[in-house]
Amino acid sequence: MEETAHELTVKQYVEQQRELEREAREVLPYSFDTCTYSMGYLKQPLYACLTCQKASGSLNAVCYSCSISCHADHDLVDLFNKRHFRCDCGTTRTHSIPCNLRKSVDECGSENDYNHNFEGRFCICDTVYNPETEEGTMFQCILCEDWFHEKCLQKTNKGIAIPDAETFEWLVCSECSEKYRDHLLNQKHESIAGTERAPLFLSENFRENLCPCESCISLRNLEMPMLVAEEPIYEPPEDSEDGISEMNEDPSESGEMIEQVISSTMNDVLRILDRLPRVQANESVYAYNRLKSELTDFLTPFARENRVVTKEDISNFFLERSRISKNLR
């Protein structure tokens, strides 16, 4: 029989699943099974959930894990890294819906700070960011952590072209530079210290040029610790490479290949079961084990003989299961 686009041998299926996992790991390289709420206030990757914002009427942001495990089908805005923030998932800010990862509703982080980024708006132009249509480079202010278009920075820089991105490491937006300029740089930098309403472009070693007077040091330690030392950024642990990607390249035994296929396919089922209520989960585990056993028996001859598994074969398998199930009722 000729193989069609919908017909695969078990070995081909294994190879396809391995490639899909590799691609998925490139897009989502980190594990997403732990909410950061219990870790307190962190500088971490955040995602504003516009869906929950509409439901609760409150600005919010959730951690990397919750963006996938709890809000995957919601309208999310990637905020990148934000400092001193506690995950809002499972709080009143996300409509008091329990977090799937910690199974509870908790108080929202009272120290969280929100700006227009949490509405999906960025820069002094206050426009909605659309990654599909956005052109040009955006830079993040080291102080307020808002993001700015290169063209908008040039306008606030009195029309003077901003430096090449490779020549500076950090940005201080025009609003923050005006607010803190007396405490940012040593007064010997007269051309910079005297500039009003203009962005500052800081080199990697800018901390060596900060004003050394006691009042400025005290202010920086209290209000601008990010200028004193680089902040640690929390990153979720990398996703373990278990499952299909660890399969032997060419299993010698058909039984081994079948076990690999079944185990890999069922891993996602187990993750879902872990989030179900206990009684429902127990019933589902029984059904899961029965399906795994039946599917193993069904696929073994195909793997042993390297036969093609067709769409019709799979349909017949589930039709037979359905027929037996009805007879047992």
From Swiss-Prot:
GO terms under cellular component: chromatin; cytosol; nucleus; protein-containing complex
UniProt keyword Metal-binding, yes or no: yes
InterPro entries: UBR7, UBR7-like_UBR-box, Zinc_finger_PHD-type_CS, Znf_FYVE_PHD, Znf_PHD, Znf_PHD-finger, Znf_RING/FYVE/PHD, Znf_UBR
MF-aspect GO terms: ubiquitin protein ligase activity; zinc ion binding
GO terms for biological process, alphabetical: chromatin remodeling
Zn finger region (UBR-type): 33-104
S-S bridge residues: none
Zinc finger (PHD-type): 120-179
Family: Belongs to the UBR7 family.
Protein name: Protein mlo2
Gene name tied to this protein: mlo2
